[in-house]
UniProtKB/Swiss-Prot annotation:
InterPro entries: aa-tRNA-synth_I_CS (IPR001412), aa-tRNA-synth_Ia (IPR002300), Anticodon_Ia_Val (IPR033705), M/V/L/I-tRNA-synth_anticd-bd (IPR013155), Rossmann-like_a/b/a_fold (IPR014729), tRNA-bd_arm (IPR010978), tRNAsynth_Ia_anticodon-bd (IPR009080), Val-tRNA_synth_C_sf (IPR037118). ValRS has two distinct active sites: one for aminoacylation and one for editing. The misactivated threonine is translocated from the active site to the editing site. The C-terminal coiled-coil domain is crucial for aminoacylation activity. GO terms for molecular function: aminoacyl-tRNA deacylase activity; ATP binding; valine-tRNA ligase activity. Residues 845-910 form a coiled coil. The keyword Protein biosynthesis applies. Keywords: Aminoacyl-tRNA synthetase, ATP-binding, Coiled coil, Cytoplasm, Ligase, Nucleotide-binding, Protein biosynthesis. One of its GO terms (cellular component) is cytosol. This is Valine--tRNA ligase. Catalyzes the attachment of valine to tRNA(Val). As ValRS can inadvertently accommodate and process structurally similar amino acids such as threonine, to avoid such errors, it has a 'posttransfer' editing activity that hydrolyzes mischarged Thr-tRNA(Val) in a tRNA-dependent manner. ATP binds at residue 536. Monomer. It is found in: Cytoplasm.
Length: 911
């Protein structure tokens, strides 16, 4: 659609059709090239890279929140005149994607990964990637994100793959990558090693079994306790604390293992806590990380009794071939039958599970590749401690520093096929390892062609760690890298602070010598209305596209940000999306009204003398205040507060007050202030659309295109046009200047005057509602001013009060001792308001009605108070249920007080 078509006509459709507008305008933005990021020498760029969605599937509400938050910042900064890059892309998500494809093959009855072979299986995963990449990019477009698609990246693109190899080789040459045989977390289902942070710990109810181990010489026995009886088949010692007086005399003696019959020694090690359990700890070096370290210190044997699939090995003797859990059951049964089971206790403990598939992990000794973390962590710690990198909210700084200060070496090898294959080649002739950025054909040491590449792939986070600079061309010295790096802000979920954020920081400092971004903004998770995590098992997941199809993109975006605050989870409520949709409709209808009343209007020439009244001056002042607040709040990453500020300005001040206040002037062609009202409406609406645009881009663009008034484009607009390969840039609100307070619009006096007028109207409306006086019933009112200044203001606003207060006879006078009789009263700053009720209500009937309502309210409150005084309810009910009950009780108490006050007033009138 051309710019001319967009500008045609000034009339909006009777109703807002979100789907029609969204489909047309995203294509319009793409055709216009508005979001191509220009390189403008001398201009400070603003860059944010997308946290790349995994190609495992489709986007969820968390992605919608994340990309909305980023897009708000990007649109804001673009409108401030910065050359702005929002860089999109996707992540190959090695293990997670491989799992999904294997599941897909299994469900379809296809061959297994191993039946296919590596090359054919990887081809299947590429097909999967293409399919879901297309879905993800389509979803991002639906969300209206203003990314530069010409710079889109994928973590396994040729360019990014080269960066990954360069990273590996550089760290290897510096001695920061090594191959070691250590105990690692192993997933029996996915058949791969995992890093520490890929293990999630779940609190589970289990058992603690106590077994008797007899001394080999028959002189007695000791008791050990374990939660994993199956591992005892790999015991090679029992350890006690060297200072534990109970067992000092036994150190060095031999035990006869009750399950295997082998003799094992009693050893002394300071690791053992004498106060825990019996003070005796069985040592199984192959299957426990702490036992592994003890085994190394004492030179113990390390038999493997559990295999990589979770099955018992030949070393498990008669239990060989059993599943680990079946083995547990058999051992406990044998112990009970043979008399060496002492007791069984209920025991709650943390169980490590694979973060990808949920399988209970198995600690196993294996040879893996590791990154030496201490030298990399130190500069990453300094960058945050010194304030070079700021984490928002600040409380996560301590979390980051604690993890980095206690960081363990990073296991980076994975026994999978999808991903970046480790760039190491083994020579079968001389045993040398060739580590290279390019595929070698011969061993670099002996020249043999008999070399083979390491079978494993790198942890997916190894490539993601390079995302802020590999996407811009690193390791090459590109124009994009020089101009757009370091990036500015990273917006992401707090749940990947360690997985991703920390790794980007130390990788960037190591490879580029620069921080990757100056600010990290962390947001929470999107939960369901009950506060539960969304999951397939609960069936409470929400597809953002379903929400968009029903309510529109702008409504979803606005709901997500108004419910958010940095670092905190948000709850998804359909009602709140409906409220956001209603807000969009309110804006559309108000804009339609404004446009219909601008048909005969021409913008005033600069310096023209228009007769602005107090309402005009007030709304301009309120606009300035809103613009100032929103800019400050966005600068502090307070998206929710910024959005709510705009909402309040548009809904309440502009629509509910200003438009209603100016209607009589608009409807009267002879009114000398009509032109000023039109000028104010046009300019405030145009500025308001620009203020709201980063939050609700579609509806603001659609309305703005119809305005007979345009703000100038930002300075970088011509450069954006050139970046898009165009001679000129067609108009779009997204490349106009973001509002700041307008010079000459500040008017504290008008603000103060209108505050009294509005408070007076609100008081009249409140009395009308309180006494159920019909909306169309004209009510007489006496307004007593408490000062000469207030009297002047109220007289100036008489027409406003009469019109919006729907008064009959309105008396405005100085405050007097004699008050109107039989009148409802209200007090505001600067005035007392009285509404005589004679003839408006049947006093006895109203007293009877309110008395009944007071009794009912009191009974309901008593029930809730009884519930809240019940300890059983307070301790057993869910916290959210208790909180809701408290809120209901507080509301009823407030209602009771209001009813009592109203009854007292009516009874005093009754005499």
């Amino acid at each position: 659609m051309s710019a001319e078509q967009k500008q045609g006509g000034t009339e909006l459709a009777p109703r807002y059709d979100a789907k029609l507008v969204e489909d047309e305008y995203y294509q319009y933005w793409m055709d216009g090239g508005f979001y191509r990021a220009p390189i403008v020498e001398g201009k400070q760029p603003y860059t944010i890279v997308i946290p790349p969605p995994n190609v495992t599937g489709t986007l969820h509400l968390g992605h919608a929140l994340n990309n909305t938050m980023i897009d708000i910042l990007i649109r804001w900064k673009r409108m401030q005149g910065h050359p702005t890059l929002y860089l999109p892309g996707t992540d190959h998500a090695g293990l997670a994607t491989q799992i999904r494809v294997e599941e897909d093959l299994r469900k379809s009855g296809g061959p297994t990964r191993h039946e296919l072979g590596r090359e054919a299986f990887v081809a299947k995963v590429w097909d999967w990637k293409e399919r879901y990449h297309a879905t993800i990019t389509s979803q991002l477009r639906k969300l209206g994100v203003s990314v530069d698609w010409s710079r889109e990246a994928f973590t396994m693109d040729e360019r990014l793959s080269r960066a990954v190899r360069a990273f590996f080789v550089q760290l290897y040459k510096k001695g920061l990558i090594y191959q070691g045989t250590r105990i690692t977390h192993w997933c029996p289902k996915d058949q791969t090693a995992l890093s520490d942070i890929e293990v999630e710990y779940e609190e589970r109810q289990g058992h603690m079994w106590h077994f008797r181990y007899p001394l080999a010489d028959g002189s007695g026995s000791i008791v050990i306790a374990t939660t994993r009886p199956e591992t005892m088949l790999g015991d090679t010692a029992v350890a006690v604390n060297p200072e534990d007086e109970r067992y000092k005399h036994l150190v060095g003696k031999m035990l006869r293992h009750p399950a295997t019959g082998r003799e094992i020694p009693i050893i002394a090690d300071e690791y053992v806590d004498p106060a825990f359990g019996t003070g005796c700890v069985k040592i199984t070096p192959f299957h426990d990380p702490n036992d592994f370290e003890i085994g190394l210190r004492h030179g113990l044997e390390m038999p493997q009794v559990i295999g990589p699939k979770g099955e018992m090995t030949e070393a498990a003797g008669k239990y060989a071939g059993l599943d680990r859990y079946e083995c547990r059951r058999r051992i406990v049964a044998d112990a009970e039958a043979e008399g060496w089971l002492v007791k069984v206790e209920e025991h709650q403990h943390a169980v490590g599970c694979c973060a990808r598939c949920g399988t209970v992990i198995e600690p196993l000794i294996s040879r893996q590749w590791y990154v030496k973390m201490k030298p990399l962590a130190e500069p990453a710690i300094r960058a945050v401690e010194s304030g070079q990198i700021k984490i928002v909210p600040e409380r996560f700084t301590k979390v980051y520093l604690h993890w980095m200060e206690n960081i363990q070496d990073w296991c980076i090898s994975r026994q999978i096929w999808w991903g970046h294959r480790i760039p190491v080649w083994y020579c079968d002739d001389c045993g040398h390892l060739t580590v290279s950025e390019t595929d070698p054909t011969r061993c670099e040491k002996c020249g043999s062609a008999n070399i083979r590449q390491d079978e494993d792939a790198l942890d997916t986070w190894f490539s993601s760690a390079l995302w802020p600079f590999s996407t811009l061309g690193w390791p090459d010295d590109t124009a994009d890298l020089r101009y757009f790096f370091p990036t500015d802000v990273l917006v992401t979920g707090y749940d990947i602070l360690f997985f991703w954020v920390a790794r980007m920081i130390f990788s960037s400092l190591e490879l580029t010598g620069k921080i990757p971004f100056h600010t990290v903004v962390l947001h929470g998770l999107v939960r369901d209305a009950q506060g539960r995590k969304m999951s397939k098992s609960l069936g409470n997941g929400v597809d953002p596209i379903d929400v968009i199809d029903q309510y529109g993109t702008d409504a979803l975006r606005f709901m997500l940000v108004t419910g958010s605050s940095p670092g905190n989870d948000i709850r998804f409520h359909t009602e709140r999306v409906e409220n956001a949709r209603n807000f969009a409709n309110k804006l559309w209808n108000a804009s339609r009204f404004v446009l219909m009343n601008l048909a005969d209007w021409q913008p005033a020439a600069e310096g023209a003398a228009l007769q602005y009244d107090v309402a005009d001056r007030w709304i301009r002042h309120r606009f300035n205040e809103a613009a100032r607040a929103v800019n400050e709040l966005l600068g502090e990453y307070q998206y929710g507060e910024a959005a709510r500020t705009i909402y309040d300005f548009i809904w309440s001040e502009f629509c509910d007050w200003y438009i209603e206040l100016v209607k009589p002037r608009l409807y009267n062609p002879a009114d000398p202030t009509r032109a000023a009202a039109q000028e104010t409406l046009a300019r405030v609406l145009e500025g308001t659309l620009r203020l709201l645009h980063p939050f609700m881009p579609y509806i603001t663009e659609a309305i703005w295109q119809k305005l007979p008034l345009r703000s100038p484009q930002v300075e970088t607009a011509p450069e954006i046009a050139r970046a898009a390969g165009r001679d000129a840039l067609p108009p779009s609100i997204s490349v106009t200047a973001y509002p700041t307070p307008v010079e000459g619009w500040a008017d504290a006096e008008a603000n103060e005057r209108m505050a009294l007028i509005i408070d007076t109207i609100r008081a009249l409306r409140s009395i009308r509602a309180e006494f159920r006086l019909g909306e169309h019933t004209r009510i007489d009112a006496v307004v007593m001013a408490t000062s000469d200044q207030a009297l002047a203001i109220l007289n100036e606003g008489r027409a406003f009060i009469e019109n919006l207060g729907k008064t009959g006879q309105l008396t405005i006078q100085p405050v007097a001792e004699a008050k109107p009789k039989n009148a409802a009263a209200a007090v505001v700053t600067g005035a007392e308001i009285y509404v005589p009720l004679g003839g408006l209500i049947d006093l006895p009937k109203e007293i009877e009605r309110l008395t009944k309502e007071l009794t009912t309210t009191g009974d309901e409150l008593a029930k809730l108070e009884k519930k809240l005084s019940n300890e059983g309810f307070l301790t057993k009910a869910k916290p959210e249920v208790v909180e809701k009950t408290r809120e209901e009780a507080a509301a009823l108490a407030e209602k009771r007080q209001a009813l009592e006050n109203r009854l007292a007033m009516l009874r005093s009138m009754q005499g």
